[in-house]
Amino acid sequence: MSGKFVRASKYRHVFGQAAKKELQYEKLKVTNNAWDSNLLKTNGKFIAVNWNASGGGAFAVIPIEEVGKAPDQVPLFRGHTAQVLDTDFDPFNDHRIASGSDDSKIGIWDIPENYKFHDHVDEDGEPIDIKPVKFLTGHARKVGHVLYHPVAENVLASSSGDYTVKLWNVETGKDMITLKHPDMVTSMSFSYDGNYLATVARDKKLRVWNIREEKIVSEGPAHTGAKNQRVVWLGNSDRLATTGFSKLSDRQIGIWDAFNIEKGDLGGFYTVDQSSGILMPFYDEGNKILYLVGKGDGNIRYYEFQNDELFELSEFQSTEAQRGFAVAPKRMVNVKENEVLKGFKTVVDQRIEPVSFFVPRRSEEFQEDIYPDAPSNKPALTAEEWFSGKSVEGPILVSMRSIYDGSAPSFHEAKRPQQPTTQETALEEKKEQPKVEKPISESEKEVKQEAPKSPSPLKSASSSSTINHVLKEDNSINKLLKKSSDIDQVNNAEDPSRDTSGWEEADDEPAPIKIETPVTPTETKKDRTPKVEPSKELKPEPVSIATDRKQEQSLPQEEKSSEKTKSPEQEKSATPPSSITAAKTAITASSKEEPSAARTSPKSLGLKKSVEKLSTLVLQLEDVVDKLTKANLDKDERLLKLEQKIGELSK
């Protein structure tokens, strides 16, 4: 994903660490139900786990601090008549939790203030089960997933086997909004501001809904594999991440523009491996890190998300596979130990193992760069306000510094990101830095140079006509040719287009001069000087200013040498500087080449110097033409995409 080179990132050394055995939760009875859910949920104070209970469905709630072995008889949250499939904590009430069940009901539960998992018993020593506060009814089939709203309190989303997603006012118990799907929803995720909901269903399609309008904003095919898919909204952005499978059962990750799913995933699917377990995605908005937890394996991969690309950071490996995983809110991490994620995984359906991820730093001060403000437990809206149409830009944020200092928490409203996230801006950013985030190997570069993408006819015609127009308007080549002609006249050179440079007796001497044209570091041409054919046409193209200045500086020196050259002895001393100037470099001729150059006749030297200059110009012009061609093709590609976008917006 990021190639085999080392990226500069402050999260490059993030590592995962499992808790010691004495800090784990043991002797648990995790459900063996095959329904695809995370099995665990946590709010940083409690852990909810779907329980393998008889006589109807139930789940257990474990306070974080009550580690160790569970007693034989534990208090359970009972009330459903069938298996509990999913749970979710209220983000604005640490003692409120919702559950979805196979009995088509949604249970709302309150955790008692004095609740203890190990010692919540009556006078006879029997565990006291907790009853639901209310049931929400309205689904016709099992409720597979429940999810609380991130901004408004008492707003709950639920997906069911009746192919619908319902939005509930928990306080009144009414289903206010129903989003109908053609198949069962397997995963859903709210946007940062809570106005949109992303869903993936068994029809293999990804959808983004404007919830209160009950309309699909964007829709398109996602992963092609037969197994369930997952979706997560990537924080305060308009990007989504999905996990799924290809037709060949490769596990994949996809990045999407939430409001333009039709154009496909951004940059192609990332192939992870060929394991059979579903990848559970968790996104950390504060650090821009996407964690992928494999269901049925012990690996947790994590990637940094930047500029619509994922860059692999590392992988937490374990020999003990997990079926369930839960992540605590960011405000619950250990700030003093530079913990960036607090997670919990199930192990062999009998144990819950805490897993934390850390940024290794020695400083004992507050690390402000890795701890931006995080969502708090304060709601930004009430249920009535949200259902009536009121919106905010995001949840109420709490300062992580206040948590570090132990002072009174400071809150403020979330704001939209400063960078514009429109499609045009995203395309421009990717065009300006195409090789910084996803570098291309040398072999791929060679393939691209040999067989570039064939542009559309419109693009090709536009680019060629643009280049021709630019070349016709540019008069710099005429000036350069005039300078070259003046130099030839100064050195008494013959016109190379005329066949008058026959061999003379003086030309029969052995060891002719061999002048090589040095190539500047930016040039990719061969070192040897190619032959110049009289019939070759030079395409007009701007040449670097540095070359012009060097040639202008060489002119007065050569004029003086030609005026003072009265005898062969004086001409011998003037020849090496002029040949070096013609080569436009600072490389000095060797002592062996100087005598042979001095023995060459003035006429042949002048001709060779003009050939040398023309050869250098040809190489430079070819290089500039290549660069101009590439730049114009890139420009036309951007213009074409802009036109397509304008056309879509105008419809």
Curated annotation (Swiss-Prot):
SMART domains: DUF1899, DUF1900, WD40. WD repeats lie at residues 79-110, 138-169, 180-210, 226-257. Residues 618-650 form a coiled coil. Residues 452-465, 578-590 have a biased composition (Low complexity). Keywords: Actin-binding, Coiled coil, Phosphoprotein, Repeat, WD repeat. Residues 427-451, 523-540, 547-572 have a biased composition (Basic and acidic residues). Binds to F-actin. Belongs to the WD repeat coronin family. This is Coronin-like protein. It comes from Saccharomyces cerevisiae (strain ATCC 204508 / S288c) (Baker's yeast). The gene is CRN1.
